[in-house]
């Protein structure tokens, strides 16, 4: 919004050229989202408390968590407000990637809000049924996947629909240009061609998978928000490189016109996340709930797809991956042993993985900070793929 205003008034005030610089707008988006979160946080927490939207705690979990019962949840609304305002103020609203990321983020946010609402109203920690949640995630994820298959392939906004129709007329057999290939980290100028169907399948898996992985990780005070901020900031760097014809050529990455604008979104997400951490750090005054976790995970997955860094997201988001795998392994092994031996057996003391460490004697704050440190190391490793190729 401010970019369009600056471009319109640029002839009358030369200092407005500052608003056309991507890095300046990214810094301002971070500050804007951070200030909004810090200022509005107490008010949002009071409102959530008045609405009696307290978190229900599993009785079979660590006993130290029982004191958290009643802590306001659905605080992810605060994050989404900061992201929305900062992105709309400082982003280029003609950029197609901004809008598709916003659609996925807030679409998944709505799913999470409904899930949280049911948990609060019906006092049921399970919320929406897994089938219902997965269905709506799939609707949004598939729409985004189909759209991105052609918008990543085409530099011109107008021709995205034309490209889609050309694919339909080809009998759904048309390929995609090289910039839509799956990039392999650490390998210079080597990528794997996906085709339209492969791109759609991978994109769907990344977006929906990232959303649920972040949601599973959100179980301790401050645990998930800092990894989201770190991974989001790292993806913002990739977006800046991919969106620049100069830097992408120098670093031997495909140039994706318009991708650089995602730095604004990632910066806004970082600022909003840090503001939320102010109130979510131990002992938490508010939890983000599914409204925040599902939305942020979907956002990370969508940005990773646009900048063609799906594998790097898998690396940098290693904590999310480990948490998800711990649940999958626990459930699978329990069902197998129950069928085989008549009683279910567990690999971990409790899943997701952070609860296993808690029950192993780690304090909550130890688990949280150590997971942060691991994520920081993984993000630095992921960023090294910019040059180590």
Curated annotation (Swiss-Prot):
This is Phospho-N-acetylmuramoyl-pentapeptide-transferase. It is a multi-pass membrane protein. Its cofactor is Mg(2+). The lineage of its organism: Bacteria, Pseudomonadati, Pseudomonadota, Betaproteobacteria, Burkholderiales. It comes from Burkholderia pseudomallei (strain 1106a). It holds the Pfam family MraY_sig1. GO terms for cellular component: plasma membrane. GO terms for molecular function: metal ion binding; phospho-N-acetylmuramoyl-pentapeptide-transferase activity; UDP-N-acetylmuramoyl-L-alanyl-D-glutamyl-meso-2,6-diaminopimelyl-D-alanyl-D-alanine:undecaprenyl-phosphate transferase activity. It is found in: Cell inner membrane.
């Amino acid at each position: 919004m401010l970019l369009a205003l600056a471009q319109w008034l640029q002839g009358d005030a030369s200092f407005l050229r500052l608003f056309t610089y991507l890095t300046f707008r990214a810094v301002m988006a971070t500050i804007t989202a951070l200030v909004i979160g810090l200022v509005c946080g107490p008010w949002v927490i009071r409102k959530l408390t008045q609405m009696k939207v307290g978190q229900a705690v599993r009785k079979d979990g660590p006993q130290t968590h029982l004191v958290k019962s009643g802590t306001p949840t659905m605080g992810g609304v605060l994050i989404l407000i900061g992201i929305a305002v900062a992105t709309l103020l400082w982003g280029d609203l003609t950029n197609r990637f901004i809008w598709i990321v916003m659609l996925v983020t807030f679409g998944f946010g709505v799913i999470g809000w409904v899930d949280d609402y049911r948990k609060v109203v019906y006092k049921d920690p399970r919320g929406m049924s897994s089938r219902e949640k997965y269905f709506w995630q799939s609707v949004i994820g598939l729409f985004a996947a189909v759209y991105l298959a052609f918008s990543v392939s085409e530099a011109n906004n107008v021709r995205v629909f034309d490209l889609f129709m050309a694919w339909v007329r080809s009998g759904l057999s048309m390929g995609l240009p090289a910039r839509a290939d799956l990039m392999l980290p650490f390998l210079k100028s080597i990528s794997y061609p996906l085709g339209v169907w492969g791109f759609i399948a991978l994109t769907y898996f990344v977006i929906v998978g990232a959303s649920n992985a972040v949601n599973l990780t959100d179980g301790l005070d401050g645990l998930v928000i800092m990894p989201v901020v770190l991974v989001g900031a790292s993806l913002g760097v990739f977006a800046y490189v991919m969106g620049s014809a100069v830097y992408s050529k120098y670093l031997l990455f495909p140039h994706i016109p318009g991708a650089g604008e995602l730095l604004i979104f990632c910066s806004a997400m970082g600022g909003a996340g840090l503001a939320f951490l102010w109130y979510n750090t131990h002992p938490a005054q508010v939890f983000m709930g599914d409204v925040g976790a599902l939305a942020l995970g979907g956002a990370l997955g969508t940005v990773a797809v646009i900048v063609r860094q799906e594998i790097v997201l898998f690396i940098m988001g290693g904590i999310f991956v480990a948490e998800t795998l711990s649940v999958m392994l626990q459930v699978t092994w329990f069902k197998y042993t129950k069928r085989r031996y008549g009683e279910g057996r567990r690999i971990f003391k409790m899943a997701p993985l952070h609860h296993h460490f808690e029950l192993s004697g780690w304090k909550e704050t130890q688990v949280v900070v150590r997971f942060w440190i691991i994520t920081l190391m993984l993000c630095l490793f992921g960023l090294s793929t910019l040059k180590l190729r």
